[in-house]
Design a protein with these regions (language model features):
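Terminal and linker regions of secretory-pathway proteins
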Residues: 2-523
Length: 523
């Protein structure tokens, strides 16, 4: 697919950051001295920087941590949460940063599996208006092109304060909607920053929305429900209704093709059967798109009516119908109590990190420590941004058409991972999307991702190797299954949901160490 117009757009905007907007490049004003109710922090800097080319009031918040281990001084990780419109502090506080909440309190404790032990780590609240970032009114960012241009321009300004990071080995990592952000950001950075090329080594997409929308939603939903029928408490007649829908809609044939290794050819994905990418839900939010469409299906007849005859969802709406059915069963007492689409094993006792974040980061003393005084009430996710960007036309070209070029022509490694308990963006849709992608002269993986990886060894040379970097031995627990070919890796984590590090911080630490930062040469 031709991405020339997109890159030309970025190249035009790349000149904007060179305007004399940044009056001072003294980073000391961003130094974080301490944080209330927190153990000692690694050296860090936080605050807001304006987006060059935007009018006053559009500023992006960052929190930068210095590498704790000098052996990883050459590594620079940039972390993005998704949403769109969710703060990167969700990742920082949720399992990959140096601090986390102590149980269900807002007291902070040290995280022994912080990625700051593996490199310099930058958390960015983008697009403007996300988390501690600010935005003008009316909301100025309405397209993916704008998001990309803003971030690229902002990052160039960021490097004027922290120029030593510009020469590091850069790894862009994120989850969920960051599966769309990261391919565009990477393409723009490698195409536009020609005078001072960045050494971008890899992209990591966790439970990301990077693939074909139908493939990652309706096509894969029935198969996921079958694989998790017991956990989802699905009656046999309801499961049969979804099985029949898969056959009627041709989804079973699509998935059968994806189970052939290597693929026999391009897999035809039905054209977006639900008339939009997929329903997006967030904790403590009502549905942003098509909220009135839910018919609360309880019976087989209700399910069939929603799948085949909904005037809201469109034809073959297995994804939205599944979400509605499981939600309805949960509310009615026959399903999973307090059902969470992000992790089907969550229940009513699960700690709500977003609520704790809202309480802690709304404190005036915390905001003063992070140099964002006067922000007022903090929200981890911004529903205005979510509605604005998900209601906009899909990004063109799609993210999955950009990734192969970055891997093939730019030699940038691509690491994809999923948690098995994520229903929002389930692993079956991810695996289908990988098998339908062509890079470095071949389509998909040639063998099924069934090699084992382990708690402290995310990239064993072979499944019988018992001397991995984490000191693995015969009693070490299996963490999941994986594969890698031609510069692309895929890991499926057992016992994890949408945010893998929230369930499996130790395993994700090994993943970043072994796969992202320490990947073998020749990828």
């Amino acid at each position: 697919m031709n991405i020339g117009p997109f890159l030309f757009f970025i190249q035009l905007l790349w000149s904007i950051p060179h305007l004399p907007i940044f009056k001072s490049t003294n980073a000391s004003r961003f130094k974080v001295r301490s944080l209330p109710d927190s153990p000692a922090l690694p050296t860090s800097w936080a605050g807001r920087l304006p987006v060059p080319g935007r009018k006053d009031g559009n500023e992006i918040f960052f929190w930068l941590f210095e590498a704790e281990n000098k052996a990883y001084d050459d590594t620079f990780i940039i972390w993005f949460n998704g949403g769109p419109g969710c703060s990167s502090l969700v990742g920082l506080m949720g399992g990959n940063g140096p601090i986390s909440f102590d149980g269900n309190s807002t007291l902070l404790e040290h995280n022994p599996y912080s990625w700051t032990q593996l490199g310099h780590v930058l958390y960015v609240d983008q697009p403007v208006g996300t988390g501690f970032s600010t935005a003008s009114n009316p909301y100025p960012v309405t397209t993916n092109e704008m998001i990309t241009a803003d971030f690229v321009a902002w990052l160039n300004g960021f490097f004027t304060y922290f120029p030593h990071l510009q020469s590091k080995r850069i790894h862009l990592m994120g989850e969920s909607y960051a599966g769309i952000y990261i391919p565009y950001f990477t393409a723009a950075l490698v195409e536009s920053n020609t005078s001072h090329p960045l050494d971008i080594r890899s992209m990591s997409l966790g439970d990301g929305s990077w693939g074909n929308a139908a493939a990652m939603s309706s096509v894969a939903m029935g198969a996921y429900m079958r694989s998790q029928a017991t956990a989802l408490k699905l009656p046999s007649d309801i499961l049969s209704a979804f099985n029949a829908a898969d056959q009627s809609c041709g989804f079973d044939d699509v998935l059968a093709q994806a189970q052939i290794y290597p693929p026999k050819g391009k897999i035809n994905i039905p054209g977006n059967p639900e008339n939009f990418n997929y329903r997006r839900r967030r904790r403590d939010m009502t549905d942003v798109l098509n909220a009135s469409c839910s018919i609360s299906p309880k019976t087989v007849a209700d399910v069939n009516e929603s799948i085949f005859n909904s005037t809201c969802y469109g034809p073959c709406a297995t994804y939205s119908t599944a979400m509605d059915y499981v939600d309805t069963a949960s509310a009615g007492g026959t399903g999973i109590p307090c059902f969470d689409v992000y992790d089907i094993h969550h229940d009513c006792s699960t700690i709500d990190t977003l609520t704790l974040m809202a309480e802690y980061f709304s404190r005036a003393d915390v905001q003063a420590a992070l140099h964002v005084s006067g922000r007022g009430t903090y929200g981890a996710c911004n529903s205005t941004i979510l509605g604005t960007l998900l209601g906009a036309p899909s990004a063109v070209p799609p993210a999955y058409s950009i990734l192969p070029n970055l891997v093939t022509e730019r030699s940038i490694s691509l690491h994809i991972y999923n948690g098995e308990w994520d229903m929002l963006l389930n692993h079956i849709g991810t695996e289908l999307s990988i098998q339908n992608m062509t890079w470095r002269g071949a389509q998909g993986f040639s063998t099924k991702p069934q090699q084992l990886f382990y708690v402290d060894d995310a990239m064993p040379m072979n499944s019988s190797d018992m001397t991995g970097p984490g000191g693995r031995n015969a009693t070490t627990k299996v963490a999941g299954n994986w594969a890698e070919e031609r510069g692309v890796s895929y890991h499926l984590f057992r016992g994890a949901g949408h945010s893998v590090f929230a369930n499996k911080p130790r395993e994700m630490f090994a993943y970043v160490r072994d796969v992202v930062v320490g990947a073998r040469n020749g990828w």
